[in-house]
Amino acid sequence: MSEKKKSFFKKANKKNAAAENLSAAERAKAADVEEIVSPMRQIVNNFMSRKLAVGAMVLLIVMFITMFVGPLFMPKYSDSYTDVTQQNIPPTMSLASVPGELKNDIKMIDGYGTFTVGLSNSGHVYIWGSTKIGTTGVDVANIPADLPQGNIAMVAAGIDHVVAIDNDGKIWCWGNKKLGQYGTEAEVLAAGGEVNPNIAYFPQELADNGVVLSEVKKLTCGYQASAILMNDGTLYLWGNKNGYKNFDLFLAAGAMYDMDFTLNYIVGVNGRRNSIFTGSRGLYDVVRPNVGAKSVKIATYLDGRTIEDVVTTNNSLALILSDGDVCFAGDFSSDAVKAPTLGADEHYVDVVGGAMHYTGLTNKGNVYTWGRNNLDQCEMPGKTTGVSKIYGGSFQSYAVDENDDLVSSWGLKG
């Protein structure tokens, strides 16, 4: 290689080495300078580095979507819906959970509020649902230790108490008793209390002598009130008089053929079985052949037929007539499901009422449910064949076969 070429390559190598040394120096200098980041980006970086904060943000977003977007996919949901019988309920999915020991030996089931009471043919009482009564500290699942399990004949559930009658005619009550749900006036005075004029105390006659079981036509409970109707029309009524606008009228009323409680009124069927007694003129003087149908005067609709049974919800009543027809009075929500139109050879043999719905059983063994469906009260399961008895809770229905086995249940589970 010529001296000229050697000189050229030598100079080139020196330049490359200088360039490499300069780049290394610049890189070292740059490393000593802190990277400039915008304040917003710094906030985001700090937040994303905290796993707990990120998790909380994700949870907040999910809650927002559930609250504001979820209802768009829930057509039955209403943020304005309230029900006085369903207040102060802790989380539960047991509202329709019939105990296993009762499922194949059902004599009767009854419910009014957040819990349901059942009775087996062997005379044992069972209670399920949300059994703790609000903030009272009372739990209706605490059945009295001296209750003669295996010897109970009838049971009924109120909003916060239970009434039972044993085979000897003795009446048993438990639950909340602060507003006269049970307990005689003499017991209050003996305990040093004062008589409350707004309470109709448990009749002393019943406390002393009980009832003749074969003469009991109906045992029923309402909102902090209870009643026993005898076959001869005698009505024993006790509880919180402030809960019903016509309580005193029924205390003084004569014989009744049938009676029941709505949320605000006591309703009765007179001895002639051709009208509804409430003590308020015009309250139930008209009836409808179906939910939402045009009202007609009750005398016109009956046309010689008589009332066999009265069944109630919170705001309405259903009358089962002597020919198996059913008509209605009172208030229904605008979205209520209508009762089905039965064929000429089909009629109702039983109807039970919940808080806002009815369930009916026909002579053909078909079961139908109608009324408000906001909590799936009318969402019947497919298997409802072979049914011979029906029972109702506040937002539940129960179908039982001729062997007293539970066929199906539906409605609000929790």
Kindly label every feature range from the protein language model.
Residues 2-131, 135, 151-158, 252-259, ...:
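Gly/Trp-centered helix-boundary motif
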Residues 113-114, 123, 159-160, 169, ...:
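Short coil/turn segments that connect the beta-strands within blades of beta-propeller domains
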Residues 115-118, 127, 161-164, 173, ...:
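Conserved core positions of repeat-based scaffolds
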Residues 152-154, 216-218, 253-264, 306-309, ...:
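Repeated scaffold domains used in trafficking and secretory/extracellular systems
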Residues 384-414:
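Ankyrin-repeat and related helical/solenoid repeat scaffolds used for protein-protein interactions
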